[in-house]
């Protein structure tokens, strides 16, 4: 009997379009000799829509439902995703997706799911909290100033100008896929950047700009996590924002990255240490800055990285000899393993 994968995609965050791209790639890569795929779309309004089921590979003309093609007659209660023995693959990016909220819902339903648990998902989603945890683990971070809604913005800008030097990067603390990020060369640009970032979150991070290469390491496993050789994001733009990443195609990837063996070893060790520090499970992608001075800074942990066939995470594992279909199989097996352990802890 084939294993059922419940593919959850869409969502309420600004990254919902990325989620659709990732989910379509997963549904095409699945080994249909082993799996059946049932898909549920989460609309921008947060409604659950039962969409397609696939017992064999979809055709090129098959497309997943989006906010533009919703069939409201297929709206269901969120709990309708439950199926005994099924494993949920929440291909959801950003808030209300990889921030622990959906993970908590799935644990209430008592369903195995791919990826990090409630704690590690919510922790890694918040950039400020992640930085503080990783600092405690001895992992170097780019200098930063945290700003929370209600703070005296003028005083915080003065703190930024005292502790950091322009250019600086302003980021919503609780957002992914480079959404809401701005580069500022002066105080006026910083004020505008803060306004933009506060549109997406009530907690904002201002980081020192560094002249650095962007290097990424893939992580796979539960308590025996393994890492990939690093890959490099090669940009034709000033910084790696949402449009450059997903719309303008101004980014290429160099896998493996052309860096020394010593740097590779440090990055892989730091990535694995960071994953354990947040209590990670299943998968993550760890992003580093490697400066022209030879400094290595851990930028962030992404607990549900982009999963399209051209995304860095699956390509990193392909370079390690694990194909996209095999990667999905391993993630499903890891989900069942962590579910069994979680259930065993409930006495």
Curated annotation (Swiss-Prot):
Pathway: Cell wall biogenesis; peptidoglycan biosynthesis. One of its GO terms (molecular function) is ATP binding. Belongs to the D-alanine--D-alanine ligase family. It catalyses: 2 D-alanine + ATP = D-alanyl-D-alanine + ADP + phosphate + H(+). InterPro entries: ATP-grasp (IPR011761), ATP_grasp_subdomain_1 (IPR013815), D-Ala_lig_Van_CS (IPR000291), D_ala_D_ala (IPR005905), Dala_Dala_lig_C (IPR011095), Dala_Dala_lig_N (IPR011127), PreATP-grasp_dom_sf (IPR016185). Keywords: ATP-binding, Cell shape, Cell wall biogenesis/degradation, Cytoplasm, Ligase, Magnesium, Manganese, Metal-binding, Nucleotide-binding, Peptidoglycan synthesis. Mg(2+) 1 binds at residues 287, 300. GO terms for biological process: cell wall organization; peptidoglycan biosynthetic process; regulation of cell shape. Its EC number is 6.3.2.4. ATP binds at residues 161-216. Mg(2+) 2 binds at residues 300, 302. One of its GO terms (cellular component) is cytosol. This is D-alanine--D-alanine ligase. Binds 2 magnesium or manganese ions per subunit. It comes from Streptococcus pneumoniae serotype 2 (strain D39 / NCTC 7466). Its cofactor is Mg(2+); Mn(2+). Its main location: cytoplasm. It is found in: Cytoplasm. Cell wall formation. Residues 131-333 form the ATP-grasp domain. PROSITE patterns: ATP_GRASP, DALA_DALA_LIGASE_1, DALA_DALA_LIGASE_2. HAMAP family: Dala_Dala_lig. NCBIfam families: D_ala_D_alaTIGR, PRK01966.1-4, PRK01966.1-5.
